[in-house]
UniProtKB/Swiss-Prot annotation:
The TIR domain mediates NAD(+) hydrolase (NADase) activity. Self-association of TIR domains is required for NADase activity. This is Interleukin-1 receptor type 1. Residues 1-19 form the signal peptide. PANTHER family: INTERLEUKIN-1 RECEPTOR FAMILY MEMBER, INTERLEUKIN-1 RECEPTOR TYPE 1. Glycans are attached at N63, N103, N236, N252, N266. GO terms for cellular component: axon; cell surface; external side of plasma membrane; extracellular space; membrane; plasma membrane; protein-containing complex. The gene is Il1r1.
Length: 576
């Protein structure tokens, strides 16, 4: 399994190299020179900024080799993440190494010259690998053992450091020196303190312990006057934090390397073993000023407690002559009403869309339910002066011919439901007019007295007078569309696919209002008003307050039908 992981890691490194020959990498002109001690473990990072390395892949090469350095942790020289490891460094490792960073848009290349050195004769170090650090005479300061961040343990703690001066153990109990993490604190700096200091530690890698050594050339500065440190952040500010959350407080200072930067809360410094508060230190050379550094002390708060809101966290910057402070006060977050508004608006919109969809699907049922349930509680409308709820217009047969299903629907089924069950009042020519009356006058008068015009259509219009071509139909449609503004309801007793043979007025009504298609049979039996046809027809009819017609009145419809059938052949001439 371990070999498989190594193989996969190597494949992941080698795949981006397939296009190496064709890609042009931008090479940094500045060369980085690095020194290492022979037989010691050493780790080198790619000297690019975090912004330059963001989103990219780091690959290391030695000299002019086209083969990347191995990612196998068992190799003495190998790449681990973006770092180059020497476990340990050997004299033959000297040379130059290329760190190449590439992503989907660009490629950066930087050169590092590596020198692996042996100790100078009679010394425990090589002077070429020395780091120069300076402190002011008569002041307090610290020497820092550099580049130990790579060797933190699993608890993110720096290793224990031993200090030597001129290769002899340095006593840390004489009042002038004491050790603190990776720092050697020097109190009341004097000229005799200058010299070469060595810090030593060790690091265990894959079960084997390797030495780590750094040498520092300590130079004293006679003039103790120095610039005042500047706290870049915080600036006496407040910070919103939720109770129980994890936060970081960053104290960013521009000052001298020896300035102390630390946090206090409620008058006390942060203890090193505090389970909730922990400090982390970092220093960088200032990019725009010589002999100045960016000192960053981060206070990690693993859990915001209620007492943290009572007192501010104070950042202190201290040297021999100056003490600067700045604070951060934690406050409870202000409720973000914007999210509530957005959420409420989203819920309202979703509800509105849902209701609109429900209404569109069940519109007919909702309107009919409202009429049946709430009409008694609404104020009565003023009378519109009309007598009939609908004027029924249907095709007339030529001569003595008759279509029984049409007569059954017009004179039996339609009145039975609309008049018998829902109390509507219909005017049906041939039932409600009198023998001998002028058809044009009857039509003109009764259309004006009706609230709706129901036009009944059948598929085979060839056996009927054409709707809209006889005087009766022309008057009815004209009055409904033009003069009276009456709503027209088209009823298809049979499914009609082609309306091109229909009069233009019928085509216009069909296009604008559609038609209701009959889906039942024409047997003379009680009709259920709960079918979709009758619901759609009732929806198109005006709201009704009257009670259904009595059973006695309904029984009179059949004699009327018989009278119609008997008189039709005698008095009713085909229209058209």
């Amino acid at each position: 399994m371990e070999n498989m992981k190594v193989l996969l890691g190597f494949i992941c490194l080698i795949v981006p190299l397939l296009s190496l020959e064709t890609d042009k990498c931008t090479e940094y002109p500045n060369e980085v020179i690095s020194f290492s001690s022979v037989n010691e473990i050493d780790i080198r990072s790619c000297p690019l900024t975090p912004n330059e390395m963001h989103g990219g892949t780091i690959i290391w090469y030695k000299n002019d080799s086209k083969t990347p350095i191995s990612a196998d942790k068992d190799s003495r020289i190998h790449q681990q993440n973006e770092h180059l490891w020497f476990v340990p460094a050997k004299m033959e490792d000297s040379g130059y190494y290329y760190c190449i960073m590439r992503n989907s848009t660009y490629c950066l290349k930087t050169k590092i010259t590596m020198s692996v050195l042996e100790n100078d004769p009679g010394l425990c170090y090589n002077t070429q690998a020395s780091f120069i650090q300076r402190l002011h005479v008569a002041g307090d300061g610290s020497l820092v053992c550099p580049y130990l961040d790579f060797f933190k343990d699993e608890n993110n703690e720096l290793p224990k450091v031993q200090w030597y001066k001129n290769c002899k153990p340095l006593p840390l109990d004489d009042g002038n020196f004491f050790g603190f993490k990776n720092k050697l604190m020097v109190m009341n700096v004097a000229e005799e303190h200058r010299g070469n200091y060595t810090c030593r530690t060790s690091y265990t890698y894959q079960g084997k312990q390797y030495p780590v050594t750094r040498v520092i050339t300590f130079i004293t500065i006679d003039d103790s006057k120095r610039d005042r440190p500047v706290i870049m952040s915080p600036r006496n500010e407040t910070m919103e934090a939720d109770p129980g959350s994890t936060i970081q407080l960053i104290c960013n200072v521009t000052g001298q390397f020896t300035d102390l930067v630390y946090w206090k809360w409620n008058g006390s410094e942060i203890e090193w073993d505090d389970p909730i508060l922990a400090e982390d230190y970092q220093f960088l050379e200032h990019p725009s000023a010589k002999r100045k550094y960016t000192l960053i002390t981060t206070l990690n708060v693993s859990e915001v407690k209620s007492q943290f809101y009572r007192y501010p966290f104070i950042c202190f910057v201290k040297n021999t002559h100056i003490l600067e402070t700045a604070h951060v006060r934690l406050v409870y977050p202000v409720p973000d009403f914007k999210n509530y508004l957005i959420g409420g608006f989203a819920i309202f919109t979703a509800t509105a869309v849902f209701c609109a969809c429900i209404y569109k699907v069940f519109k007919v049922d909702i309107v009919l339910w409202y009429r049946d349930s709430c009409s008694d509680f609404l104020p009565r409308k003023a009378s519109d002066g009309r007598t009939y709820d609908a004027y029924v217009l249907y095709p007339k047969t030529y001569g003595e011919g008759s279509f029984a299903y049409l007569d059954t629907f017009v004179f039996k089924l339609l009145p039975e439901v609309l008049e018998g069950q829902f109390g509507y009042k219909l005017f049906i020519c041939g039932r409600d007019d009198y023998v001998g009356e002028d058809t044009i006058e009857v039509t003109n008068e009764n259309v004006k007295r009706s609230r709706r015009l129901i036009i009944i259509l059948v598929r085979d219009m060839g056996s009927f007078s054409c709707l809209g071509q006889s005087s009766e139909e022309q008057i009815a449609i004209y009055d409904a569309l033009i003069r009276e503004g009456i709503k027209i309801i088209l009823l298809e007793l049979e499914k009609i696919q082609d309306y091109e043979k229909m009069p233009e007025s019928i085509q216009f009504i069909k296009q604008k209002h559609g038609a209701i298609c009959w889906s039942g049979d024409f047997k003379e039996r009680p009709q259920s008003a709960k079918t979709r046809f009758w619901k759609n027809l009732r929806y198109q009819m005006p709201a009704q307050r009257r009670s259904p017609l009595s059973k006695h009145h309904l029984l009179t419809l059949d004699p009327v039908l018989d009278t119609k059938e008997k008189l039709q052949a005698e008095t009713h001439l085909p229209l058209g």
